[in-house]
Amino acid sequence: MSCHLIQQIENQQRKEPAETFRVGDTVRVHFKIVEGKTERIQAYEGLVLCFKNSGVRRTFTVRKNSYGVGVERIFPLHSPRIERVDVVRAGKVRRAKLYYIREKIGKAARIKARIVKKPSPSA
């Protein structure tokens, strides 16, 4: 009984991302920041290291290098604060978690590009 209620509430809170992305993709996350009374949108661009959990609790970790220091940020996938997620570059990886990238430096931290086929317009 209570499981059904929880699932109903979670389904109401679920938000489908406009563009799907995978682990290994370089993404730009646009999210809202509230500073006092003002609200602005900030972009955070980096490599998707992993997805965790499922349902409404699903999160993804994005890693970027900022002035030579690796910075990671965890975003809830269905958060109302996330405006949109744009895929900058599709990556080809064979792992679900890319934690090994943390130890890599420079060219060793590169990810191969994945060729994405776009649907052709039907005339």
UniProtKB/Swiss-Prot annotation:
Organism taxonomic ancestry: Bacteria, Pseudomonadati, Spirochaetota, Spirochaetia, Spirochaetales
Organism per entry: Treponema pallidum (strain Nichols)
Coiled-coil portions: none
One GO BP: translation
Protein name: Large ribosomal subunit protein bL19
Classification via InterPro entries: Ribosomal_bL19, Ribosomal_bL19_CS, Ribosomal_bL19_sf, Translation_prot_SH3-like_sf
Keywords, ordered alphabetically: Ribonucleoprotein, Ribosomal protein
Matching PROSITE patterns: RIBOSOMAL_L19
Alphabetical list of Pfam families matching this protein: Ribosomal_L19
NCBIfam families linked: rplS_bact (TIGR01024)
Domain of life of the organism encoding this protein: Bacteria
Protein role: This protein is located at the 30S-50S ribosomal subunit interface and may play a role in the structure and function of the aminoacyl-tRNA binding site.
A Gene Ontology term for the protein's cellular component: cytosolic large ribosomal subunit
Example GO molecular function: structural constituent of ribosome
Family: Belongs to the bacterial ribosomal protein bL19 family.
